């Protein structure tokens, strides 16, 4: 059994590949809890022989994960960004600078597609929101990074004297502070998605598919789908965003299925 580890800024998500079979559902922990992974490993009836993962939570957290796995006799191999990964080309000026979770999640989306596929946009709404585009040629064209919905909200509350930690509906014309903040956050997130979708449509000359992921998606789903519908007047009917529960783990599973995953 090979463990699949997605170590993000807020959450640690774990899956596995066992004789070609995937986990029925990912296991998620608070990534600030140093004992959660080790405690969970102690409950397993079958011990993993290898862990394959990506870590964007820093070297200290990566070492904590390594130590927890080592305590159960399981080595970990961290996937890092590089110019090409299983045919997915990394268009970053400095390929190693691209977050490994972003590259692997794009690989996870591509693993679902036919060999010939339209361009696609993947928007992941976590602590940070990333919106990345891949062309029909399997080349990562580039992407955006912005604060995620929760980080936008908490930043306003922390960085200003009079703004609350808002909880309000998204409306066209907000008439109180909670509405104004909630609507502004949704507009910023949705507007960024639509911007990148339109850019992909123009660049490739055809409609791009849209995939979404992350815990922040429900908060911005309605606004994103509404703005995409409005954008249809410009670029043709937009696709309904397809939600993916764990694209990073999907990409790691594809890597784990290779003959020698530790060489990747």
From Swiss-Prot:
The active site is at 101 (proton acceptor). InterPro entries: ATPase_NBD, Type_III_PanK. Keywords: ATP-binding, Coenzyme A biosynthesis, Cytoplasm, Kinase, Nucleotide-binding, Potassium, Transferase. A monovalent cation. Ammonium or potassium. It catalyses: (R)-pantothenate + ATP = (R)-4'-phosphopantothenate + ADP + H(+). The keyword Ion transport does not apply. Its EC number is 2.7.1.33. ATP binds at residues 6-13, 127. GO terms for biological process: coenzyme A biosynthetic process. PANTHER family: TYPE III PANTOTHENATE KINASE (PTHR34265:SF1). Homodimer. Catalyzes the phosphorylation of pantothenate (Pan), the first step in CoA biosynthesis. Belongs to the type III pantothenate kinase family. HAMAP family: Pantothen_kinase_3. This is Type III pantothenate kinase. It comes from Bordetella petrii (strain ATCC BAA-461 / DSM 12804 / CCUG 43448).
